[in-house]
Structures are given as C-alpha cells and as structure tokens.
Amino acid sequence: MTLAEGPIALAALLAGTAVDRLLEPSGRRSVAVAVAGAGAGLVGAYDDLYGSRHAKGFRGHLRALRSGELTSGMIKILGVGASAAAAAILVQLCRSSCATPACRVLSSLLDTALIAATANLVNLLDLRPGRAAKMIIVLGSGLVGFGAAPAVGAAAGSLPTDLAGRSMLGDCGANALGAAVGTAAALALPWQFRLLAFAAAATLNLASERVSFTAVIERTPLLRRLDQLGRREPVLSMSTNDQT
C-alpha cells in the first residue's frame, strides 16, 4: 500500500485548475479552488509523512494541545482552516450578492467552515478502497460547472489503483480533493444551502468522534453495496488513521 496516490491526485487537481484558469474569464474561481486544495493537500502530506497516531479526532488533538503538545493533526487542522479562509476570501470576490461589509464577513466565515468541514469529512472516509474517491465523484459531479471538475477528474483517475488496494489518497489527497469540492459548493450554492451543507458536514464530523462510519456502512445493505462497488477483494483496513 502506497500513499503516492495523494500527491499525484493533488498534482492532477492543480493541473486541472490551471486549465480551468485559462477557460475562465476572471480566473478567480479556479484560483480559489487551487488555494484550498493546495493548502489542505500540503498539510495533509505533512501529516502523512510525520503524523503521530496516538492522538485521534479533534478532541484528541485538543487534549494534546492543552498538555503542551502540538500534534501533526492539529497542524493539519490549522492549515486546512487557513487555506479554507484564504479560498473563502477569493470566493467572496466572485460573489455580488453581499452588499454590506457584515454580509461579506459572515458569508466568508460560512464558506471557510464549509470548505474545512468538507475537507475533513472526505478524509474521514479514506479507510476503505475507493470510498473517498467515490464520495468526491458523487459530491463533485453536480458542481463541475463551479470549479469541481479538476477534483472529480483527479478522483476518477485515482480510482482504479485505489479500488485495487494498491494505493490510497491519504490525508494529502483526501483533504485536497475535499477542500476543492467544498470550495466549488461555496461558489455554487446560495447561503441557505451552504448553511445546510455545512450543518450536514459538521454533524458527520462530530459523529465520527463516537460512531464508526465503516460499521454503519456495513450494517446498511445499500451503502455496503455502493461501498464495495468496483472493489476487487475485501480489505480489512487501509489506514490506522481513522480520525483526523
């Protein structure tokens, strides 16, 4: 099992945003997607390379921080948040619906939260072959006209080796593609639907602290069939990192 799929997916994402930049009149949309994806991917790669697994989940990293330890997971959380905030500012420049400074600030905060929550949610799913890549394709397919096409293409390209169990997206690829799709959602949706999307992503992130997504999927016949679709052989586990 190799983690090389993650950097390759990140490179494919950035190449796709570069092409999108040439086709887009203003270029701001593709830059926002690239900023979110690159930032999340880089800190994810750091966690892949140097991460310690003794602290898991957001609460675990907070407990470690209170004890004076800055974990690689907390560095990733901060890095994903910072890149999401930068992307949210660029998203706001693409938007004309906010006429007041207060509206722009609130809108940017919502976009930041949505992008970061989506990035982490996709990463939480990267525990079985093809699961995270399938989620990117499902979430991003309806957003290809808003900057998600590079993420969908990168996920589709990684799917064969991922499903075969030869490689995985890891924190680098999963966070990068998740952040890119989250940015596309921020670009595409009105604030009411962005709020609902964030609420759903945040709820799932919080639920992961107590509930095993894999166990839920295994107990649900439809989800189990979709999860196993295209998988060549049963795999017990792809990663020891089952939380952020």
Which role does the model predict for each range below?
Residues 200-244:
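Membrane-proximal soluble regions of multi-pass membrane proteins
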Residues 1-211, 215:
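"…together with the soluble PPM/PP2C metallo-phosphatase catalytic core" -> "…together
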